[in-house]
Amino acid sequence: MKKMLVEFRDFALKGNVLDLAVAVVIGAAFGKIVSSLVNNIIMPFVGVLLGGLDFSDLSFKVGKSVIQYGAFIQSIVDFVIIAFAIFIFVKVLTSFIKKKEQPTEETPVPPTEEYLKEIRDLLKEQQK
């Protein structure tokens, strides 16, 4: 049992697992921010453009069940905005990484044979 706990601790404290945990927490917080942006800023403007339509209240009844398709539309808008924001973030991040990875142009090192030939020629001239 102790060995299993040690293995679990080692697994849980690896960089990748901690990075994933931090990413999940930040992602959840980011999702709340985007949902607030969509619900409180974007959708009211869309509603005004569409004649005062409030998407969150859109629904219809089937028997005793209520189908709230307005909430579904709201979720789709949330998803599109979150996906676009992540796309932009990844695109910017990869452009920074590519800039850092671009090798600096180094002067080509002459091959060893060329040096040897030059040394040979210099030695021949000195012997004359």
From Swiss-Prot:
InterPro entries: Mechanosensitive_channel_CS (IPR019823), MS_channel (IPR001185), MSC/AndL (IPR037673), MscL_channel (IPR036019). PROSITE patterns: MSCL (PS01327). Its main location: membrane. Keywords: Cell membrane, Ion channel, Ion transport, Membrane, Transmembrane, Transmembrane helix, Transport. It is found in: Cell membrane. The keyword Ion transport applies. The chain crosses the membrane at residues 11-31, 70-90. It is a multi-pass membrane protein. GO terms for cellular component: plasma membrane. The keyword Transmembrane applies. GO terms for molecular function: mechanosensitive monoatomic ion channel activity. Channel that opens in response to stretch forces in the membrane lipid bilayer. May participate in the regulation of osmotic pressure changes within the cell. Homopentamer. PANTHER family: LARGE-CONDUCTANCE MECHANOSENSITIVE CHANNEL, MECHANOSENSITIVE CHANNEL MSCL. NCBIfam families: mscL, PRK00567.1-4, PRK13953.1. Belongs to the MscL family. This is Large-conductance mechanosensitive channel. It comes from Listeria innocua serovar 6a (strain ATCC BAA-680 / CLIP 11262).
